[in-house]
């Protein structure tokens, strides 16, 4: 069965159903996979008295001829007693006044569809519906990145899975280029009526060398078995990273010789926009190419040279090269 994007939305809203007598709070849709379980946090309000009958239907349909709901009965509890579910998969963990929490363990693909909570008090009846989506295999978590990542600035990476269930422990683990990271990751779960999820947050101070690297969040079962994963490629904004090459390599020449300096841009994100050369900290005029050629040098051109390349993040500067121009005694 195709999973309808469980990572796309964190169910922060409530599903409300309200007649003049009934009100419910629960996640609108719950997600699980074959063999796992579903924990359905649920609260309700019945103003006319205590709950007398509760039936959990699978894909209920109202029959106008009988004025009753038809569908598979997964669980039933009346004032006369409880009717156990098949293999006791379904547990009603609520009460007769405000709690309608349910558990289905194990859950199967054919449980997907609509769950109907048929509630009856002494004078009122209500059918509350909850969507259940069960995939054949464990669905992947989803890595959430901040809008922009910049070198040396701490960011938080979030790995989110729209699943959590008591009695079915899982673990989210972080990897960078296949190497485990995330010893300081903060893990949390929610089984509230507002949302059901498992989350891991990793604080990370990326360097420019992390640009283009692969970050993975893996989902593991209680036995450590790999279940699924999500991967992203880091886009780390950084200033240009430079290296300067000189010919001759020792940067020692005689007056009248020529010198060539090349500014190599090993990395720049985003692409660089300007190039300049400096001698002893002062910009050289009309020198805005990656190659600087000095023809027939004089002793006055001895000094420290470097290149500076800028992008939208800022300027990057190479190491300095000391050019030594030898000359005859005057």
Swiss-Prot record:
N-acetylneuraminate binds at residue 118. It comes from the Eukaryota. GO terms for molecular function: carbohydrate binding; CD4 receptor binding; protein phosphatase binding; sialic acid binding. SUPFAM superfamilies: Immunoglobulin. InterPro entries: CD80_C2-set (IPR013162), Ig-like_dom (IPR007110), Ig-like_dom_sf (IPR036179), Ig-like_fold (IPR013783), Ig_CD22 (IPR056386), Ig_sub (IPR003599), Ig_sub2 (IPR003598). Keywords: Cell adhesion, Cell membrane, Disulfide bond, Glycoprotein, Immunoglobulin domain, Isopeptide bond, Lectin, Membrane, Repeat, Signal. Residues 18-330 are extracellular. Coiled coil: none annotated. Residues 18-136 form the Ig-like V-type domain. It is a single-pass type I membrane protein. Disulfide bonds join 37-165, 42-100, 159-217, 263-307. Residues 141-233, 240-324 form the Ig-like C2-type domain. Glycans are attached at residues 65, 99, 110, 133, 162, 187, 229. GO terms for cellular component: early endosome; external side of plasma membrane; extracellular exosome; recycling endosome. It is found in: Cell membrane. Predominantly monomer of isoform CD22-beta. Also found as heterodimer of isoform CD22-beta and a shorter isoform. Interacts with PTPN6/SHP-1, LYN, SYK, PIK3R1/PIK3R2 and PLCG1 upon phosphorylation. Interacts with GRB2, INPP5D and SHC1 upon phosphorylation. May form a complex with INPP5D/SHIP, GRB2 and SHC1. Most highly expressed siglec (sialic acid-binding immunoglobulin-like lectin) on B-cells that plays a role in various aspects of B-cell biology including differentiation, antigen presentation, and trafficking to bone marrow. Binds to alpha 2,6-linked sialic acid residues of surface molecules such as CD22 itself, CD45 and IgM in a cis configuration. Can also bind to ligands on other cells as an adhesion molecule in a trans configuration. PANTHER family: B-CELL RECEPTOR CD22. Belongs to the immunoglobulin superfamily. SIGLEC (sialic acid binding Ig-like lectin) family. This is B-cell receptor CD22. The gene is CD22.
